[in-house]
Amino acid sequence: MVKGYDLPKTVDKNTLVVITSISGNTIETLTTLESATKKDCSVIAFSSGGSMESFCTKNNVEFRKIPQIHSPRASFPSYVYSILKTLNSIIPIKKQEIINSLEQLELLSKEISSENLSDKNLSLNLANWITGTPVIYYPWGLNTAAIRFKNSLQENAKTHAIIEDIIESGHNGIVSWERPSDMVPIMIEGKDDHIKTKERWTILRQYFEENNITYKEISSLDGGILSKIMSLIYLLDYATIYYAARLGIDPSPIKSIDFIKERL
C-alpha cells in the first residue's frame, strides 16, 4: 500500500496498480496515478469523480465511479464492497464471506444505533468511558481497524490518539506507562489471535492492573477477516461520533484538513 507520492521501484508494466480516492482529488493519490500511467502499469481507479475521473477519461485508464455518501469517512463501507466486487477475481474473499459480513453489520447496526441508548450499546459505552488520550492496542491482522479508529477519533472528535502493535509495544511502548499521563489504553483483541498474542494480552492486562491503570477491551466478532474488520470499524466509528457528541463537537467540519488542502 502506498500512502505517499512515490511508487516502489519494483513497479513496472507487469504490475496491477489499484488507485482509490473517495473524493477523487487527493493530491498524493493523483500523483501516484500519473506515475503508474507513465510506467505503463495496469491501472484501475476508484473515486466519486473529481480530478481522478477527468485524468482517467483523458488517458484511457480503467475507472469505476462510486458515489460519495455525505463525506469520505461515511462512504468507506460502500467503497470497500464496491471494490471487492470489481476485483473479486484477484482478491481471495469468497462471496459467502462478503454476505456474512453484511449480515453482521446489519445486526450490529441495531445494537449501536442511537435508538438504543442502553448499556448494551457497545459504541456508546466506549464513548462514555474515554476520559483522556486513547492509546489503541491491536494484534496482527486488525491493524486496519485500529488505524481507522485513530483516524476517526481525530476527525470526528478532534482528539489525539495513538496506536500500538501489541507485540511491538512489549519492546518499547510499554515503558511509557511508567510516567503519569492522561493516556487511556484501549485493547482491540481478535477472537482467533495467535496463542502467543493471547498470552501478551494477558500479560498486558496484568501490567495495567498492577499499576492501577484502567483499560478497556474490545473484542472482534467471530467469522472471517472481512467480518471482523468491518464490524470493528463500524462499532468504533460510532463510538467516535458518540464521543464527539459527548464533548459537544460537530463531527463533520474538518477545518484543519481544509487548511492544508488549500495550500497544496
Place the predicted regions along the sequence by residue.
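Glycine-rich phosphate-binding loops that contact phosphosugars or nucleotide phosphates
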Residues: 1-108, 190-195, 199-214
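A generic structural motif
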Residues: 1-5, 159-170, 214-223
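A short, glycine/Asx- and small/polar-enriched loop/turn
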Residues: 11-15, 131, 233
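Conserved beta-strand elements of the Class I
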Residues: 16-18, 135, 186
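Conserved active-site and cofactor/substrate-binding residues in soluble primary-metabolism enzymes
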Residues: 74, 78, 96, 100, ...
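Active-site phosphate/pyrophosphate-binding segments
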Residues: 88-183, 262-264
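C-terminal active-site/capping subdomain that shapes the small-molecule cofactor and substrate pocket
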Residues: 175-255
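A short, charged, Gly/Pro-tolerant segment at domain boundaries
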Residues: 253-264
